[in-house]
UniProtKB/Swiss-Prot annotation:
Pfam families: Ribosom_S30AE_C (PF16321), Ribosomal_S30AE (PF02482). SUPFAM superfamilies: Ribosome binding protein Y (YfiA homologue). Residues 100-123 are annotated as: Disordered. PANTHER family: 30S RIBOSOMAL PROTEIN. It is found in: Cytoplasm. Its main location: cytoplasm. It comes from the Bacteria. GO terms for molecular function: ribosomal small subunit binding. This is Ribosome hibernation promotion factor. It comes from Deinococcus radiodurans (strain ATCC 13939 / DSM 20539 / JCM 16871 / CCUG 27074 / LMG 4051 / NBRC 15346 / NCIMB 9279 / VKM B-1422 / R1). Keywords: Cytoplasm, Translation regulation. One of its GO terms (cellular component) is cytosolic small ribosomal subunit. Required for dimerization of active 70S ribosomes into 100S ribosomes in stationary phase; 100S ribosomes are translationally inactive and sometimes present during exponential growth.
Amino acid sequence: MQIYQLSGRNVEVTEPMREYVEEKLSRLDRYTDQITDARVTLTVRDVRNNERRNRVEVQLNVPGGIIRAEEHHADMYAAIDKASDVLERQLRKFKTRYMKQRQEGRPEPLPGPAEAEVNAQGSGAAMDDVSEFHPEIVRQKRFELRPMSAEDAVVQMEALGHDFYVFQDLQGQTGVVYRRRDGHYGLIGSS
């Protein structure tokens, strides 16, 4: 796998570091050749908890979705290892779903996971056995989307006590605001 973007925040990405990332992520090629883009960000942070000092974020674009992992560790190379392991589990799941849909005669490409985000606290161990993963939708909600600004959507989200809020922006596009782990907010919109 070729890494299209490798960047560092508060750290210089050395050639040995680049080679290590490429070596670890090249293992993922055995699961799919449909990775269209790969972005890796290595970050060193000044935090009290040394175990969270180094952060590795990896985002892989596959047909129909994004596969993402974020891992923390005191050692940058160990964080890279952990992120690679998480991505391997997620791609194994992706490949299993893809093959199952092909066998059932469904059209290609497989709609991949909307976003599979895993962090150091929940490193995806529940997904180790892909064949046992059967998601069950236990509740459905339908509601009218009212036009509002992203800031108003955040206010609504906080008022409801939710971690995300789906809304229609002032241009008529659907968007989602969400609470990030760092306490800030994110906005997801369609292109």
